[in-house]
């Protein structure tokens, strides 16, 4: 089934594109959630009419993500954890911990956008990539320190 994307969808494409997907995926997920519309003649004509609006909305979203990335550059969050021998952490620092540390600094980031290849299990400073969307990423530093007893 051919559909018209109403908004950017990471696995399918950008808003305004016509893509082909499985019928069930379109009918049961994309169309009911308002992510896409069926690509019939009427909707294609409406798309041509609304294309300027879609492009403007996508550009506004990209600028918002870029300004957020600029505000995040240079941000360092410190997380204190109990350590054992050889500065090994008891447990690990996960995306949820980083999200909470950023919230304490009044920076609201969804933990799903924090990219961790694997949880942090050592003391030190680590660069962390945050995917903000629209192809925009930001990098912050996470400083893991031993907890004071």
Curated annotation (Swiss-Prot):
<dbReference type="GO" id="GO:0006412">
    <property type="term" value="P:translation"/>
</dbReference>
<dbReference type="GO" id="GO:0019843">
    <property type="term" value="F:rRNA binding"/>
</dbReference>
<dbReference type="InterPro" id="IPR000244">
    <property type="entry name" value="Ribosomal_bL9"/>
</dbReference>
<dbReference type="InterPro" id="IPR036791">
    <property type="entry name" value="Ribosomal_bL9_C_sf"/>
</dbReference>
<dbReference type="InterPro" id="IPR020070">
    <property type="entry name" value="Ribosomal_bL9_N"/>
</dbReference>
<dbReference type="Pfam" id="PF01281">
    <property type="entry name" value="Ribosomal_L9_N"/>
</dbReference>
<keyword id="KW-0699">rRNA-binding</keyword>
<dbReference type="InterPro" id="IPR020069">
    <property type="entry name" value="Ribosomal_bL9_C"/>
</dbReference>
<dbReference type="GO" id="GO:0005840">
    <property type="term" value="C:ribosome"/>
</dbReference>
<comment type="similarity">
    <text>Belongs to the bacterial ribosomal protein bL9 family.</text>
</comment>
<protein>
    <recommendedName>
        <fullName>Large ribosomal subunit protein bL9</fullName>
    </recommendedName>
</protein>
<dbReference type="Pfam" id="PF03948">
    <property type="entry name" value="Ribosomal_L9_C"/>
</dbReference>
<dbReference type="InterPro" id="IPR020594">
    <property type="entry name" value="Ribosomal_bL9_bac/chp"/>
</dbReference>
<keyword id="KW-0694">RNA-binding</keyword>
<dbReference type="GO" id="GO:1990904">
    <property type="term" value="C:ribonucleoprotein complex"/>
</dbReference>
<dbReference type="InterPro" id="IPR009027">
    <property type="entry name" value="Ribosomal_bL9/RNase_H1_N"/>
</dbReference>
<comment type="function">
    <text>Binds to the 23S rRNA.</text>
</comment>
<dbReference type="GO" id="GO:0003735">
    <property type="term" value="F:structural constituent of ribosome"/>
</dbReference>
<dbReference type="InterPro" id="IPR036935">
    <property type="entry name" value="Ribosomal_bL9_N_sf"/>
</dbReference>
<keyword id="KW-0689">Ribosomal protein</keyword>
<keyword id="KW-0687">Ribonucleoprotein</keyword>
């Amino acid at each position: 089934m051919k559909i018209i994307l109403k908004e950017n969808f990471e696995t399918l494409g950008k808003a305004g594109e016509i893509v082909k997907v499985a019928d069930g995926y379109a009918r049961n997920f994309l169309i009911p959630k308002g992510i896409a519309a069926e690509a019939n003649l009427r909707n294609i004509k409406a798309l041509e009419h609304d294309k300027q609006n879609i492009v403007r909305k996508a550009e506004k979203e990209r600028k918002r993500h870029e300004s957020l990335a600029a505000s995040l550059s240079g941000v360092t969050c410190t997380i204190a954890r109990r350590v054992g021998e050889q500065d090994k952490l008891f447990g690990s620092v996960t995306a949820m911990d980083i999200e909470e540390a950023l919230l304490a600094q009044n920076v609201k980031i969804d933990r799903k956008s924090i990219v961790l290849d694997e949880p942090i299990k050592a003391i030190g400073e680590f660069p962390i990539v945050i995917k903000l969307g629209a192809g925009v990423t930001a990098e912050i530093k996470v400083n893991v320190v031993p907890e004071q007893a």
